[in-house]
Amino acid sequence: MDRTKSKSSGFLTLSAGALGVVYGDIGTSPLYTVREIFGGAYAIQLTQENILGALSLIFWALFIIVAVKYVVFVMHADNHGEGGIMALTALALRQRHRRKHRAWIISLGLFGTALFYGDGMITPAISVLGAMEGLGIATAALSHYVVPASILILLALFLIQRRGTERVGRLFGPIMLLWFLSIGTLGFVSLRQTPEVLAALNPLHGFRFLTAHQGLGFAALGAVVLAVTGAEALYADMGHFGKAPIRVTWFAVVFPSLILNYLGQGALLIRNPEAVQNPFYLLVPEWALYPMIGLATAATVIASQAVISGAFSLTHQAIQLDYLPRQRMVHTSESERGQIYAPAVNRLLLISVLALVLAFGSSSRLASAYGLAVVGTMVVTTLLALVVAHDTWRWPGLALLVTGAVLLSVDLSFLTANLAKLGDGGWIPLSLGLILATVMSTWKKGRDVLFARLQQESESLSRFLQRLTDEPPPFRPVGTAIFLTARNLSLPFALLRNYEHNQVIHQRVILLTMTTLDKPYAAEKEKITIEALEHNFFRITTRFGFMERPNVLRMLNLCRHAGLHIDLEQTTFFLGRETLIRSAERGLNRWEEVLFISMFRNAYNPTGYFKLPVDRVVELGTVIAI
């Protein structure tokens, strides 16, 4: 009985957490979606048939994209319980060994990842602006304070990131539950006054809407997609909460509340077309307007926090999988391993978000830029999930064809509609995606070229050990020397240089390789492998998941449990410090060389990244031409 109660309590806790983190973005979309369809740059004439058609498209977009695609299909593609586009890319690569196939999958994954960063810049700006615009509905005199108030809120949000959000995070679930109950109730009250709006659930209304307006109706899809922004979070945060809590909260709370609110806004527009200036806030009774603005502000801050945390987590994954240079990462919670703060990413997001708020000034103007980032990520997710369905799940060809045709037809329709908004701001996330994808691919390519150069100039471990047998070093100091080495280098460059210049080999030498697996967390039994070699050399391989932080001191404890005792006071860590210069040899293009060398110089030092004791580290420099 107690076990059942404990399981129920744990499930409810996870469900509340999912409400607070996963659904913040999609839950605040009613603030601007309907208004954008009928009052935005591609506004549709306000007639009852058009209102029913637009609401029908919103309902079926939520059902097909979120309920069917993400909740049923994509969430099945978990990488040992973890989700997100980097995890999906690693999963899609697992069965692909041809270089050309891997290159395409990596390019897709990197572009989708880059678009997610674009989403991370736009979500806080559009969400907080959308909430603050309620001030103009309350009284026209306050409309001038929308942008300044938004900037203050966003500044506070980004400045508290360094302290972590563990404490206030406990309030996210209850606040979002209150938000969903409130918007659902507001919609239901309006719906009861105009029940004929329920006809919008018939997909024929959506079809007629598109065919009747042709080009303009198709362009309106670019606004309809705003209703599904944040759908990617269902998959990205799966590792934190699990599939069941996310699925249950979607069908039990989020989906009904969203549909009720959208139908309620449509009912209001049928009764009062002038409400198009802000149908969300005009649903609210006058006495409840200020409390609702406060609740909406809290909900949009929570939505922004979820995206910011997602950007930190994605950066950590990209570094571990070697798609980005090392950066300083701070774990802000001792109990929650997913609580990460990336100072450089936080600064970049803050500057970008404030620039967007100042440049666009309203959620309506930002909506054009928003849709393209969201849909681009969705298309990439669909393609990668289809690769997994083919390679890993072994789906039959017909099932794969039908699923791909349905999902891609929806995704590509929304993508095409949003491409029409390139000139209105859609170029921002697209340009950002191309730039970031180029940065990540250049880093990956540059690292491969660098390791190839090191391998050329290095010596095989077996030959080096034979050299020690033939010509023993004149002096072997007491203690342990640990040399960090890449997975594809048999002999660390620092060891070779140290021996050539100093003719010194310590009494015990450990060659340490840290490998990142294509899954989030390494099992205890595979975390460490110890191999004894000649001349008191040891090769140690430690394995980490892409959600874990490499920690050398923790590795020393694992060695102790495995029977190899290492006294830290008698241990020196030798690191290679490579200085890169441009080479005449072909490997990277000239612009790639400049970019890679710049990133390499500015990467966070390995001493801090791997948590090495600074008083036990020796760096040996060398010049490498790439």
UniProtKB/Swiss-Prot annotation:
TM ranges: 11-31, 55-75, 103-123, 140-160, 171-191, 216-236, 250-270, 282-302, 340-360, 369-389, 395-415, 422-442
Pfam families the UniProt entry points to: K_trans, K_trans_C
Predominant cellular place of this UniProt entry's protein: membrane
Protein origin, superkingdom: Bacteria
InterPro entries assigned: K+_transporter, K_trans_C, K_trans_N, Kup
Molecular function in Gene Ontology: potassium ion transmembrane transporter activity; symporter activity
Keyword Cell membrane tagged: yes
Reactions catalysed, as given in the entry: K(+)(in) + H(+)(in) = K(+)(out) + H(+)(out)
Keywords: Cell inner membrane, Cell membrane, Ion transport, Membrane, Potassium, Potassium transport, Symport, Transmembrane, Transmembrane helix, Transport
Subcellular location: Cell inner membrane
Gene Ontology cellular component terms for the protein in this record: plasma membrane
Record membrane topology: Multi-pass membrane protein
Classification via HAMAP family: Kup
Role summary: Transport of potassium into the cell. Likely operates as a K(+):H(+) symporter.
Family: Belongs to the HAK/KUP transporter (TC 2.A.72) family.
Name listed for the protein in its UniProt record: Probable potassium transport system protein Kup
Organism for this UniProt entry: Methylococcus capsulatus (strain ATCC 33009 / NCIMB 11132 / Bath)
Upper classification of the organism: Bacteria, Pseudomonadati, Pseudomonadota, Gammaproteobacteria, Methylococcales
